[in-house]
Amino acid sequence: DAQALSLLSRVGPVLMQQQIVANQVVYEANSLNMQLKANSAEALQTLTQQLNQQGFQVELGNIQPTTGGAIGMVKIQ
């Protein structure tokens, strides 16, 4: 889907800049749902703020602490 690729191409560089890895990516109903692994919960919150500033609608879901970081669910439209 062209819209999914467009979203990924715009979100990808921000993920790389924040050193955040996408463990899982699902595109459905015009939304990109991703399970992201970051160095900290704060990094996921910063990512959400950056993407909101770029005009995306972003929802940060459940964040779970892990060894060496955090995993969070993010929905982007």
Please provide the spans of the model-predicted regions.
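Periplasmic/lumenal scaffold domains of single-pass inner-membrane subunits
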Residues: 2-77
